[in-house]
Amino acid sequence: MQHHPALHNTAIESDVNRRAFMQSVASSAAVVGGLTLSESAHAAPDGKSPIIDTHMHVWANDPKRYPFPHPYSKDFKKPPHEGTVEMLMKDMDRHGCTHSVLVQVIYHGWDNTYVADCVKRYPKRLKAHGLIDPTDPKVADKMEFWMKEHGLHGMRFSAIYYENGKHGGDGWINARETHRVWRKAEKLGAVFNYFIAPKQLPKLETMVRAHPKVRVIIDHLSQMDLGAEDPEPDFRLLLAMAKYPNVWVKVSELSSVSKSGKYPFPDAYPHVKRVYEAFGPDRLLFGTGYPGAARAGYNRPPLNKEIDLFRKEIPFFTPEDQEKILGRNAAHLWGFGKST
């Protein structure tokens, strides 16, 4: 991958005044992304609260039409398991999952055509986030292209792949040029989700503070290693993001972040509770990762077990919390159920 020194070496620290920031947030918190908090785009077709999986990877089974240009692995040929949108829809229907947010899988690289086509096939049930090369000088324009021309709803940035100098380093997270991307995101109404390591969060915080109207999701509890000898310093970096009302967290991937890795992951509950107490139930999201039979291949529980994790296993979520986390929060965030 080509290295762009201007992006990696010109990180800036925004001097946004705390009071000005909070005033800006206050003016926009009730209307985030065009949705007032009184609007209810929450109902499933049967009138019940929706179940929205906010983190679903799907990939094509047709490499000629949808190739696999993995950006970090030149030797990559094809995924080890199938994970098509047809598998996803069957899984959703079987377990009462009303909607999903597709998150472009790394297998298809920066070509988001497959997830865009999936949304066109199932526009009432799916939204999609693409991947774009964060070191590309035209990243803002490419985001606009995928959103305006192909109907994507946001972008994922996988900062974790650039940690510790990998692939040119993660200086792009808060580089001067990156502010243009965030300004464009505000204009487009884009939602960002970040696959990011805890020690990278201070760089993200710079951007969140400078752009309080851009909605940002931290994936997988910031891929926290809860089995580390002392996870507390990293965990505090995640909790520090709670003071920004435009930040949400996915309570996901407990199979990989918990110490035990064994369902229902009770050793992770004390940490999840601290995130819950810091961010509140309105800014937590449900997401699982893979469709159908692919779940077992990637060591993930079945979809019904993932749903039960919030409904039956994690002990401190109230019934109202469960509805919010499993779907209502996502309905607000992405506008599920609203006419387009």
Role assignments for model-derived ranges:
Residues 2-8, 15-33, 45-54, 72-99, ...:
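Mid-to-C-terminal alpha-helical segments outside catalytic/metal-binding sites
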Residues 41-43:
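Boundary at the C-terminal end of the N-terminal hydrophobic targeting segment
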Residues 55-61, 220:
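Histidine-centered divalent metal-coordination motifs
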Residues 60-86, 91-95, 149-168, 214-215, ...:
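Active-site gating loops and adjacent loop-to-helix segments of metal-dependent hydrolytic enzymes
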Residues 84-88, 111-114, 138-142, 201-204, ...:
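Alpha-helical scaffolding within the catalytic cores
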Residues 98, 108-199, 206, 250-254, ...:
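Active-site gating/metal-coordination segments in enzymes
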Residues 153, 170-286, 294, 321, ...:
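Catalytic pocket-lining loop regions of alpha/beta-barrel enzymes
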